[in-house]
Amino acid sequence: MSLLAVGLNHRTAPTSLLELAAVSADDAPKVLHDLVGADHLSEAVLLSTCNRTEIYAEVETFHGGLADISDQLSRVCGVPLTDLASHLYVHHEARAVSHLFSVVCGLDSMLVGETQILGQVRAAFRLAQAAEVTSGTLANLFQTALRVGKRAHTETSIDAAGASIVSVGVRMAAFDLQARRPDMLVAPVASPGCDPGDAVEALLRPELTAPVEVAGPAPLAGARVLIIGAGAVGSLAAQTVRRAGAGDVVVANRTAARAARVADLHDARAVGLAEIAHEVGRADLVISSTGASGLVVGHDAVRASLAGRGARPLVFLDLALPRDIDPAVRELPGVTLIDIEALRVALDGAQVAHDVEAVRALVTTEVAGFLDRRRAERVAPTVVALRAHAAAVVRDELERLRTRLPDLDNREWDMVSGTVRRVVDKLLHAPTVRVQQLAEAPGGDSYAEALRELFDLPRDVPAIVSAPDLDLVERT
């Protein structure tokens, strides 16, 4: 049995395909039961969010498990496997563990360090438990992953990494608008006369987890903001501009329900993608983060939207990879484009890189620890079987000896039987301890196999070791 993870995400598939691959909580149990009902899977967990659909499984064989999972994903998407295959990624054993740990820590998210994924992984695991399709290996894996995710967010500042990109982008946009639109500086929050730059610095610093009271003008006071995309980045952008004092905030998304959900959270209006051209014409700031495979806003469309606008400046903040906004819009009068490249220059990347590297180091350590424990657990049933076999031999031989030495009193018999047991324990101590040590190395399973062969141990030993049986292992 081995671990296998197969899926597609915002890096490997366009939004249209991710939407087809999405599985609701109501439909997930059937998908899970279909998976474990296949020939090569014994356990499964389905993680489906707006940016990824992934299946984690314990499989009997790699190729058989891969075929079963790929076929299921093809059925979910309604896309032939020949068309879907190029968008899938496959992780086996250690890489599957590392991938899950990276996902739950937010390293694989569009918005690096976002915490929403931790709750989504927890929900996926609970759903699999409720469907009774995971118990042993995957239960252990996901429980460990959730613990690792909590460590990442409590022991590092990874939460601020993605938030910094959004906040710095909004800060740059606010500076640009303030420089070209003095009329925006009309909404004092507390004390008049505060430098607008100080207000922006105070309001839009990376710590976005709690509201911040700001003295001075709101940096986006009265600004009309259009946000294209309703994922984690879009939602954070809506939160950020609201706290910066934006006036009318509009959320546009290809999925109306998702746009409405984000809009409701941040006192905004929801519109469809068809209304983008109209809303661009009204906006002072446009923030885009759709994850689309091509441009969402083109040069000609923006030029048409600017008609009748006069001298009012327009700022585009493109937070998408690949880019959403046509770079040629920079050529249009009154238009400023701030993209990822500009943000990388403006953002102090040293701390962000430090936080990401700290989490990667944590993931590496936790993956190694998980794999070591897993290899040791695989050996434990063999050690239990060996000690149980030895105990049975000792018991039978002592019973035979008792019939041959009937004149021994209880004290003498205790001495004899105790000596025999100690001799057997000492003989078994070195090989059982050593096989557990060797099991922690790559290929360690072969040593347990050799032990079974040498002592002719049964192969149907339990995969899950009971508490009394663990005593036999710990005695080594």
From Swiss-Prot:
Pathway-wise, it operates in: Porphyrin-containing compound metabolism; protoporphyrin-IX biosynthesis; 5-aminolevulinate from L-glutamyl-tRNA(Glu): step 1/2
The UniProt entry annotates the active site at C50
What intrachain disulfides are recorded? none
Q: Which UniProt keywords apply?
A: NADP, Oxidoreductase, Porphyrin biosynthesis
Where do the annotations place NADP(+) binding? G229, A230, G231, A232, V233, G234
Q: Where does substrate bind?
A: T49, C50, N51, R52, S109, E114, T115, Q116, Q120
Q: Which Gene3D superfamilies match?
A: Glutamyl-tRNA reductase, N-terminal domain, NAD(P)-binding Rossmann-like Domain
- List the GO biological process terms: protoporphyrinogen IX biosynthetic process from glutamate
Q: What class of enzyme is it?
A: oxidoreductase
The record's comment about this protein's domains reads: Possesses an unusual extended V-shaped dimeric structure with each monomer consisting of three distinct domains arranged along a curved 'spinal' alpha-helix. The N-terminal catalytic domain specifically recognizes the glutamate moiety of the substrate. The second domain is the NADPH-binding domain, and the third C-terminal domain is responsible for dimerization.
Q: What else does the entry mention about this protein?
A: During catalysis, the active site Cys acts as a nucleophile attacking the alpha-carbonyl group of tRNA-bound glutamate with the formation of a thioester intermediate between enzyme and glutamate, and the concomitant release of tRNA(Glu). The thioester intermediate is finally reduced by direct hydride transfer from NADPH, to form the product GSA.
Family, similarity comment: Belongs to the glutamyl-tRNA reductase family.
Q: What is this protein called?
A: Glutamyl-tRNA reductase
The organism is: Parafrankia sp. (strain EAN1pec)
- List the taxonomic lineage: Bacteria, Bacillati, Actinomycetota, Actinomycetes, Frankiales
Gene, per the UniProt record:
hemA
